[in-house]
Amino acid sequence: MFKFVIYLFTFIAFANANYTTWSLVTDYTTYCPQSTEITVNNSIITITGPTTLTITGECTLDYVATVEAAPSSIPSNVTVIESNGASKLNLRSLAGAGLVAAIFIAFI
């Protein structure tokens, strides 16, 4: 069972996620160095080249952020010991247990 949990933590640590959020602003100015698309008030504005975009008045901006988890491995103070066909988890310190719990909580 513990081997599965550790493998699950490793799998979760490599997972990427996209999050969409929005901001309500009164005015918006941005410089776009290349072609891109910006969503403003649920409408897509297409930028075809380098330009400064200015929007006056209240508007809602959508942002899609890709959160990429840093590759991780099993912490050095956590080992899996195989004995008599049973898996045992040996935590050398409480810090190891805290780190594993923090990794689990961070990705829920």
Swiss-Prot record:
Membrane topology field: Lipid-anchor; GPI-anchor
Secreted in keyword set: yes
Induction: Expression is induced in high iron conditions.
Main location (coarse class): secreted
Keywords: Cell wall, Glycoprotein, GPI-anchor, Lipoprotein, Membrane, Secreted, Signal
Subcellular location: Secreted, Cell wall; Membrane
Post-translational modification: The GPI-anchor is attached to the protein in the endoplasmic reticulum and serves to target the protein to the cell surface. There, the glucosamine-inositol phospholipid moiety is cleaved off and the GPI-modified mannoprotein is covalently attached via its lipidless GPI glycan remnant to the 1,6-beta-glucan of the outer cell wall layer.
Lipid attachment, kind GPI-anchor amidated asparagine: 84
Segment forming the signal sequence: 1-17
Propeptide boundaries: 85-108
GO CC annotation, single: extracellular region
Residues modified by glycosylation: 18, 41, 77
Family, per entry: Belongs to the SED1 family.
Its job: Cell wall protein that plays a role in adaptation and resistance to cell wall stress.
Protein's UniProt name: Cell wall protein PGA48
